[in-house]
Amino acid sequence: MNFEETDSWKRASRLCVEIYKEFNSHQDYGFKDQITRSALSIPSNIAEGLERSSDKESIQFLNYARGSSAELRTQIYIGIEIGYIDKKIGLNWAQESKELSAMLMGLIKYLGNKR
């Protein structure tokens, strides 16, 4: 499966780019570093998982991507609460993250059923 052609990788990459652009000049380096790392981890783990030779390995990395998505959502919610992220933008990002997690779960189930 070519990861560049999957909707999950495309959407995760777009979300990551949006977050990087939003936090480009942010002053709180610790928060900026954490949220951008979480965002980058999602498409990176999707890519790594889909390039693996076994379904078992692919599933492992797709689960890492789901974990990073949950981590990102947590940081988004906190960012909204502390005034670092506009509420409307943040809630859109959180929804996208939820949808990505659901897409990844579908892919994990598909790969798991191939065994």
Enumerate the predicted regions with their spans.
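Amphipathic alpha-helical assembly/interaction segments
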Residues: 1-115
